Amino acid sequence: QYHTLPEIYSWLDRLVQEHPEHVEPVVGGKSYEGREIRGVKVSYKKGNPVVMVESNIHAREWITAATTTYLLNELLTSKNSTIREMAENYDWYIFPVTNPDGYVYTHTTDRMWRKTRSPNPDSLCAGTDPNRNWNFHWMEQGTSSRPCTETYGGKKAFSEVETRSFSDFLKTLKGQIKVYLAFHSYSQLLLFPYGHTCQHTYNHDDLQAIGDAAARSLAQRYGTDYTVGNIYDAIYPASGGSMDWAYDTLDIPIAYTYELRPRDGWNGFQLPANQIIPTGEETVDSVVTILKESRRLGYFNTSD
């Protein structure tokens, strides 16, 4: 089943109590309504490359928090040797809900809410799209300057306390984060930078190859078919997103955005709860491959 924000946060507390030597609580920022953006750090040894997992920045995309909590649970409890290896050779920062106000609002008021909940002066419409609010090619492509739209980018870059505080937290880990994974739904896509231009990144070919391998791994279990590509070409131009900012500003070489199940459908944000576990399983399969392939290509060599 899908869980509320208090349920997710109390589960994180429980993990800290149950695994005190490997799990520590982390606050990644705060929200307009004063909630914490809470996550955990999972670490089994010193000096590991860091994998940053950001999820549910769009409030209605509930499968993302469900999938990242599934991943977190696997890292701590799985007996599978491949997953143990992945858990213990990387440091994981996992933030299941990076838009807590919006997430709560989707449970109490409007299941289809996407944005933050901050008021917009001069408008009756509330909220900014937090994945169009980051200070990297802000307001250039696939975003709107009208507050009543779903993709409103905000009155300025980092106008939202959520994106501002979370980006400040990420900056404290600059140089340590080697992999950035952002989770969205839906469309079954695995996307990499950039969203503001069709120009390829310096490691475009690697990101395409790693992504293709990850999509093959993901498909093995249930035949779920993912398309891989840079945002601009694979989905649509969209600038001001967290992944592009993290990739560019923090020099994180391996950066992907997942668009989880389903592929399409009129109610794609309301994925039936009986698909949570399968989505989690196949997604973990693909994350294993992203890390394995990135390592094989030399991205985690400590000498750089």
From Swiss-Prot:
Assigned EC number: 3.4.17.-
Disulphide-bonded residues: C125-C148
Pfam family, one: Peptidase_M14
Keywords: Carboxypeptidase, Disulfide bond, Hydrolase, Metal-binding, Metalloprotease, Protease, Secreted, Zinc
GO CC annotation, single: extracellular space
Expression (tissue specificity): Gut specific.
Cofactor(s) listed: Zn(2+)
Biological processes annotated in GO: proteolysis
Main localisation: secreted
InterPro entries linked: Peptidase_M14
Entry note: cofactor: Binds 1 zinc ion per subunit.
Binding sites annotated in the UniProt record for Zn(2+): H58, E61, H184
Residues the record marks as active site: E259 (proton donor/acceptor)
Gene3D superfamilies: Zn peptidases
Coiled coil: none
Induction record: By blood meal.
Family statement drawn from the similarity comment of this UniProt entry: Belongs to the peptidase M14 family.
Record function comment: Involved in the digestion of the blood meal.
Name of the featured protein: Zinc carboxypeptidase
Species the sequence originates in: Simulium vittatum
